[in-house]
Amino acid sequence: MVGEPKRHTAEDNAVTMTQPRQQDPAYFEMLYEKYATDVLRVSYFYLGDRQKAEDVTQDVFVRLMLNAPVLQEGREKAWLLKVALNRCRDLWRGAWLKRVVLGSPAFELVPAPDEIGKLADEQELMGAINQLPANFKEVILLHYYQGYGINEIAEMMDLPEGTISSRLSRGRKKLESILKGGDVL
């Protein structure tokens, strides 16, 4: 009908996928509204610094607008989170970022069905997670703290699901060893 406001639907996403990105600011706005919080949350957990996480979030969406990649429908979130993780890794490895402090009372630990989720002392757990190699730390944080499934993490990190499952399993074993007073190995 003429004069009625247009509602945003899944078909709108499909239509914008065929339009040039630089000419479709509504597409970028829709992606920002939908996924900025997820990008910020993942960045914050990785970096442990709200300001740096906000900078990464801004950088991700600026890259989206400038590069205008052709994204498959339904995979936009995976692309955004992958770019955010890569940017966080760059910052984390950078010489100016010497220390990573993960965790905050502002975000709750999502209980896991195994022993990791049963630990009473979250500070001890975060200290143990900080001792893990980066590849295990990433999947542990994304799965247990952010609640992403194995398939979502695999898509974000551009790795096979089996690799993610293996890293989760090995990461849990390493955490158990650390918490019992052993080395990371």
Regions from the language model: what does each represent?
Residues 139-143:
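A short pre-motif secondary-structure segment
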Residues 82-103, 118, 170:
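Arg/Lys-rich amphipathic alpha helix in sigma70-family domain 2
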Residues 51, 151, 162:
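Residues within helix-turn-helix
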Residues 85, 157-181:
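DNA-recognition helix of helix-turn-helix
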